[in-house]
From Swiss-Prot:
Protein name (record): Histidinol dehydrogenase homolog 1
Source species of the chain: Mesorhizobium japonicum (strain LMG 29417 / CECT 9101 / MAFF 303099) (Mesorhizobium loti (strain MAFF 303099))
First-level EC class: oxidoreductase
UniProt-annotated stretches for the region Disordered: 1-25
Family as reported in the entry's similarity comment: Belongs to the histidinol dehydrogenase family.
Matching PANTHER family: HISTIDINOL DEHYDROGENASE, HISTIDINOL DEHYDROGENASE HDH
Biased composition (Basic residues): 12-21
Amino acid sequence: MPPAGGIFHRPPTTRKSRRLTPRSACSNSTCSRTWGEQPWLLALHSIDSDRNAGRRPCKRRAIAMIRTIKSARGSVVNGGNGAMTSAVQTLLDQVEQGGDRAVRELSIRFDKFDRDSYRLTKAEIDACINSLTGREREDLDFAQDQIRNFAEAQRATLLDLEIETLPGVVLGHRNVPIQNVGCYVPGGKYPLLASAHMTVLTARVAGCERIITCAPPFQGKVAEKIVAAQALAGADEIYCLGGVQAIAAMAYGTETIAPVDMVAGPGNAYVAEAKRLLFGKVGIDLFAGPTETLVIADDSVDGELVATDLLGQAEHGVNSPAVLITNSEKLALDTVAEIGRLLTILPTAAIAAKAWEDFGEIILCETTKEMVAEADRLASEHVQVMTRDPDHFLNSMRNYGALFLGARTNVSFGDKVIGTNHTLPTNKAARYTGGLWVGKFLKTCTYQRILTDEASALIGEYGSRLSLMEGFVGHAEQSNIRVRRYGGRNVGYAMPVDPR
């Protein structure tokens, strides 16, 4: 992709933080300088944020041999707009009311795919597994081993609990697997078989009793590699269904598909909106929007590495934000140059370039404290840390989907093979939740028992008075009757129990 004429506009977000965001023109109305005629020249404009930028002359520095790109044109919008919500709700209603007939109609309409039954037979599944080359099967097995091993290690940390909190009072909890889980694996544009590992395998390790999976056809046929991954991960039922109709079929059930209790897995905006609308009818893993990547780097790495990692995630989609936070201006400018170079050779440049053009951002800070603060503010899905002391960010950051520490690892490793789950929070949801993991498929359910009459009377005494403080007479009487029966005390109906 040829470099676009333009400049980088740098309004400081704080006294020290400096943000480099692509701009096609300077926002300072008093500045008439244009740079489009010199595509290898980058102008860095510094404007006092405490004054009206339109009334202040620009300070300019020219740095040679740096490519420039266009401005960020907006922010990613997650969640459906009114039209999308209405359209998705209509499709959900069709499946709820029409069952298998509606599922078939929608599959033909959207995927041009028709079958008598969308559930694959054992023979079809075996054929998909057998279609793998030896190398492909070994690679799939290796990836699934890593994901299974880490999920099993996580599961081992989730212990049931039982404790005697007072003499004769026993409290506890059990981690109970969700019984029926539906896993969605996207595959319309790319056959994202890694999502089969991340959802099906994790649910299997959690101990879910029934795991069904849906994936759309790929290029008009059953997506063989996805089906193989689903089967090897341990799916009990595999359906060649995509989009809203797949999510609806799993949530509502049809004549031939028993409903599930939870739906997990990423998808496009319509799939995400369907999950949002169905939340409450079924559980979901999280609301997933466009892929986000944040690279935090200093001058211990070079621009080629940073640019490669930014574009490697930007190719997910034209609305995938890719951000660099650095304390090295040289690295920032080198990264811009490398992005320009790589976009001339990257096969997915059409997508990655659009994402970088519209949602790319570089934030230049002076201290690691500022870098941490900016990263926590962004609360990005993926945060890759390539600094001299990456553990500083591990110990300091609070808002992120997953951290990738050091230059030896990267987000792609997490997406495909290293073992951590790639289904992660987006749109700043990392402020309040982590990503998909084995614990998402478990319900931590509490229980209690009282072993002695004395303990029942003691708890009943407090329960009686506390209930009446809130005005709940029936609650109080539940306590009182036990104080009478197990404590031998004469307590009037709906009266508080006097302390001994």
